[in-house]
Amino acid sequence: SRAPVIFRNTPQWFVNIDKDLKDGKDEFGKTIRERALHSIDKLVEWVPQSGRNRLHSMISMRPDWVLSRQRAWGVPLTCFKKKGLKPDNEDFILKDKKLNERLVNILKEEGADAWFQEGAKERFLEGLYPPDEYEQVMDILDVWFDSGSTHAYVLRDRSDGKWPADLYLEGTDQHRGFFHSSLLQSCGTQGQAPYSGVLTHGFILDEKGFKMSKSLGNTVSPQQVIKQYGADILRLWVAQSDYTVDLRIGDEILKGVTDSYRKLRNTARFLLGNLGKYSGHDNVSYNELPDLEKYILHRVCEIDKKIKSSYQDY
């Protein structure tokens, strides 16, 4: 909106990432930070390696996680605080197993809206605690907590799911987003990262390196490229690109790809044309080949091994 930002101190709910959780899941560390750093270093494969370095630096230096937000609607924190007590008091937050079970059952049946309905506090506390002695917390969770918990209901709690996930795949901006929140949430509840591998890709920019935007009129759609240049040109552009960094695309770049495509196509046509009547009866033994042809075969063999190895490693 380009409006000025106003900073002000307000009460919020935090997750202490350096507190000993004492949850019996301390194989990889006692605190969320310890578990996260161990997971980054020992349990997760990073493609490219720079992704590991970036997230490791963020986790090492980050403060506690601010969980709460003040919005009209969202996933509620679903907790009650005792009136007249301060946050450092052990009884400040109402902790009760029966109450938690009631909350889970109602929210599972009716959704998050049940928390925001009129009379919700009285309904949840009925028969357990005097409603007048408690204040219902109306803050919602950070939306990154929502996405960060997907490992539980998408993977762990599904019969066809596998936990941890083989791979989390997102753009470079998700080191501070999805990868980050998923790691903290999982380390707090499960003791380790929810993924075995993380692959980070760059973004597609216009020919001059600017972010694509409808307002700037510099967007390039795949359909537009295919219509103008053909699907094979787009495929070749993708195949020869390093997806781990930001990529540029535009008319001049695609013209260069078209030239490369013509060279490949003409070379293939030349080879096929000369091999049209080849039956295998005129084979020349390896020992009788000229040194240059032996070298070419050697390079082809090296490339073949490298490609197969890369496919298997991936």
Name the predicted role of every residue range.
Residues 260-261, 281-290:
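Primarily the internal scaffold of c-type cytochrome electron-transfer domains
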